[in-house]
Structure formats: structure tokens, C-alpha cells
Amino acid sequence: MEISLHENITNMKQFFTLVTIGALISSFTVFSSIDEVIAGMNKGNSTEIAKFFDNTVEINMPDKSNSYSKSQGELVLKDFFNSNSVKAFEIIHKGENSGSQYCIGTLLTKNGSFRTTIYMKKKGDKQVLQGITFEK
């Protein structure tokens, strides 16, 4: 059975289309968790962000730093956002390294801006938030 050149080219086009679609979907999946955390930062929404907390989360702020449980961490973050009403979150850099995701940005609030670092790590089949740092 002989395959014509035209059929061969058509099969190759279909193959590369599927590979490209697969790559796009997987790259979207990799960044979806951190993008949802960033969306929560933009709104100052501690509940949205806390959905991604690991069992314990490190939260560093200018006046206090500690490791918190999920529920404690959400309250600490909520308190921070209540004291520093969020205007916007501007991304400076976002990346991935060995399955971990990170984002460095500037959180703009009514009380000034905070250089913010978000660190997420792959745990099982999902990304969990392990640390947030706010620096004045």
C-alpha cells in the first residue's frame, strides 16, 4: 500500500496541529493556578488566594512574619488587605523552575506600594501556595 505525497503532508499537518494545541493547553494549565492567585491579589481577595494555600503558608509583611495554617493565613491576609486597600497588582516577572511557579510584582494600595513575591510548588497534581512576601 502506497501513501501519496499529498496524504503524507496532510497527515504531518494534522500531527503538528495536535502537538501545537497540546502544548498550548499544557502551558495554560501550568500557569492557571498562579494566574488565579494573581487575580485574587488584584482584587485584594484573601478567600480566592487562600484556596491555593498549602497546609501551612509563610506570610511575610513589613510588621510581622510567620508560618500559618490555611485558615490563619487567610485571616492574616484579609487583615492586611483591610488595612491596605488594593488598587492593583502589577506583574514584574512570572516564571517556573523545576515544577515551582513564582511571581514578583508590585501591589498598589491606598497606603503605598509593596514589592510582592508569590511562591507556589507542585504537590501531587496541583500547585500550592507556600509563601507570600510583602516588602515596603
Stretches found by the model and what they are:
Residues 1-34:
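Bacterial Sec-dependent N-terminal signal peptides
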Residues 75-113:
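Surface-exposed, charged secondary-structure patches
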Residues 30-45:
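Short, aromatic-enriched amphipathic alpha-helices that serve as compact interaction elements
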Residues 113-136:
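Short beta-strand edge/turn micro-motifs at domain boundaries
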